């Protein structure tokens, strides 16, 4: 009786082994190519942004995604929707993922500062002067250079009828560029300058410009502090068939390339995304880096 029962057990075991081998073979055939396409990386960077509705932050995320395609670096991104408590949670969550370097554009809050202090890794702080000393490296666009260069470009062509598009009050980059632009004007030029609040994105800028142009017809030059807000103002002018203005702006190359139509004059910045990845990788490898980095002309 025992020998008779052993044979079915042996057959069951043999069948199980054959099924396993067949399963492995089919898996390789079906999924082998997918596995081969998965790219490994040596450095993992965590990025915490206040909000992506800010044109500069949205552009930075896209730039980073593009730059990492050909590099041995991966970036995990989170945005806080303008909420400082959410940013604190984002920072802690990114740290729990085991990132090697943290990149943070901080919301003005002591809670955020405390969350940064708790990190046990290199930290790159972006574009908030109040947090200059909060991380390993502070990085920002050279707003003084950009603001002055933009004003000089415009004043070479126009002495009056200048409209400056003011961005969100919560955007430190926009505020710094505006201050540099205005500071480079003479007293008379400052008095004749018109400033229009246009919000933080293209749609808000277009709406603000439409209302403005209905009752204002003496503008000759429009100065934008980001590509998207300038483009919004341009669209409003086109829809109202106002073709008597010149449009001047500043931004990085990738943001500018998104605008395919229209005649614009640009101050072009180098890529912050590339610099973030370069510095992040150097910090990960334990190399010495500059404590303050300004992104200037392309």
Predicted regions and their residues:
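An alpha-beta-alpha
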Residues: 45, 64, 148-196, 280, ...
């Amino acid at each position: 009786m025992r020998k008779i029962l052993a044979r079915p057990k042996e057959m069951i075991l043999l069948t199980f082994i054959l099924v396993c081998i067949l399963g492995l073979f089919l898996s390789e055939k079906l999924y082998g190519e997918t596995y081969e396409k998965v790219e490994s990386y040596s450095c993992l960077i965590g990025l915490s942004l206040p909000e992506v509705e800010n044109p500069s932050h949205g552009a930075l995320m896209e730039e980073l995604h593009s730059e990492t395609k050909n590099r041995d670096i991966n970036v995990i991104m989170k945005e806080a929707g303008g909420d400082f408590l959410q940013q604190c949670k984002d920072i802690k969550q990114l740290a729990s993922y085991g990132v090697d370097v943290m990149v943070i554009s901080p919301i003005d809050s002591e809670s955020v500062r405390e969350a940064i202090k708790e990190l046990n890794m290199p930290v790159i702080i972006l574009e908030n002067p109040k947090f200059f000393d909060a991380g390993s490296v502070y990085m920002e666009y050279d707003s003084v250079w950009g603001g002055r260069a933009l004003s000089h470009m415009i004043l070479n062509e126009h002495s009056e009828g200048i409209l400056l598009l003011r961005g969100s009050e919560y955007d430190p980059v926009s505020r710094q560029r505006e201050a540099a632009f205005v500071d480079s004007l003479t007293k008379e030029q400052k008095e004749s300058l018109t400033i229009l609040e246009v919000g933080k994105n293209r749609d808000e800028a277009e709406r603000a410009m439409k209302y403005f142009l209905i009752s204002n017809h003496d503008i000759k030059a429009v100065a934008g502090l980001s590509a998207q807000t300038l483009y919004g103002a341009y669209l409003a002018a086109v829809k109202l068939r106002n073709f008597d203005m010149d449009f001047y702006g500043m931004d990085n190359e990738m943001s500018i390339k998104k605008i395919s139509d229209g005649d614009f004059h640009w101050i072009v910045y180098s890529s912050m995304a590339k610099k973030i990845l370069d510095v992040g990788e150097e910090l990960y490898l334990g190399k010495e880096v500059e404590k303050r980095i300004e992104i200037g002309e392309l």
